[in-house]
Amino acid sequence: STLCARTGLEVLTLEMPIHQHSDQASRGQEHQNWLAANFPKTRHTQVDLTPVYDHFVAAMQPGGADHDLSLANSRARLRMSTLYYHGQANGLLVAGTGNKVEDFGVGFYTKYGDGGVDLSPIADLYKTEVFALARHLGIIESILSAQPTDGLWGDDRTDEDQLGATYPELEWAM
């Protein structure tokens, strides 16, 4: 979002909680406040997707070995639909957050979810480079020190827990 805001073009950021942990929500809000203070063409809105997701879950019949994974990925797809609604309604593009390790190294994204974007400004950067860029851009410390997580499971598992390796290990392998 900061790279998009630095273009000087209009930027709309969306907070889309789905049973989100309070620390994740507060970090997001802190970042939105920082963006608004530093980039006048940035605006923010919140769309609480929890009720929509809960209705979706209630309509699904539990079954199959991948039921929990299917529900987790449904969160990413619901967010993608919301991003594209707001993008089209406002004449804006959807920018992604995927990096070289996640999108091209190990495929750690949800097809038609967080992988469904119009542009990927950090797609060519390793995760460690993303953090270095974030430090250079003055991103708030609470985000820099947070363990990366997709927030799709409703628990405290991190990206590295799910991947079974650290980002530096994955970068070394790549």
What are these regions (language model features)?
Residues A59-G64, D159-Y167:
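Short, charged low-complexity intrinsically disordered segments located at boundaries
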